[in-house]
Regions:
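Bacterial N-terminal signal peptides
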Residues: 5-15
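Carbohydrate-interacting regions of secretory-pathway proteins
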Residues: 19-219
Length: 219
């Protein structure tokens, strides 16, 4: 029995690694940026089809009632050192969402779209904060003097995340909201996937567009 369990575990790990390897990145533009969302469909992404869809050139996450806890739209390609940008908006200023980076995918019961790791948080009172989903909780609060000026309540906001070595920086609309040098040798993440969060219990809509990434040298 243990032998078959080991074989099954190996097969699942192999399938997961193959899925990551099969996610092909587009060619970078002249400035080194690669587009992760083509504006037409969810190619390269994986998530609950009851929650995620593409409308009018943006990704929409919406459901009346979400069962099984938070769910995520996952880009199954690990990244280490990079600058990541995405435009986002919470329709009607309702709900809670975030952008996962250097994260890991896991499962919780029937919910296979569970992600743990660094999250560039956003929602009422949450914009700009660094939260570790499924881990240490809040790692860095938004600079208090920046909180009133960083977001547009009813418009698109540009989130910019820079991760290089042990240091991460988050910006909203050009304003730095947090800077962290994560020196926790056991828990700090150096590499991982990118994902978009839809927070339980639902009953709101979050939108994302213009998602792009630029890879950085380690040093």
């Amino acid at each position: 029995m243990k032998f078959f369990a080991t074989i099954l575990s190996f097969a699942l790990i192999t399938a997961s690694l193959s899925a990551q390897e099969d996610t092909k990145l587009p060619k970078p533009d002249a400035d080194g940026w690669m587009t992760l969302f083509n504006g037409k469909d969810l190619a390269g992404w994986d998530g609950d089809p009851k929650v995620w869809r593409v409308k009018d050139g943006y990704i929409s996450g919406a459901i009346e009632k979400l069962e099984g806890g938070n769910t995520f739209l996952v880009f199954k390609k690990p990244f280490s050192n990079f600058v990541l940008e995405a435009e986002c908006v919470l329709v009607g200023r309702k709900g809670n969402s975030g952008i996962q980076y250097r994260s890991k995918q896991s499962e919780r019961g029937a919910n296979k779209w569970v992600v743990k790791g660094y999250q560039a948080d956003f929602g009422n009172g949450l914009w700009g904060k660094l939260y570790e989903e499924g881990g240490r909780g809040v790692l860095a609060f938004t600079y208090k003097d920046k909180a009133p000026e960083i977001k547009k309540d009813d418009g698109w906001n540009t989130y910019r995340i820079t991760a290089k070595g042990s240091k991460v920086t988050q910006e909203i609309n050009g304003t730095v909201t947090i800077e962290l040098d994560d020196q926790d040798e056991k828990k700090a993440a150096k590499e991982g996937i990118i994902a978009l969060q839809y927070h339980s219990p639902g009953d709101f809509e979050v939108r994302f567009k213009n998602i792009r990434i630029k890879l950085l040298e380690a040093k």
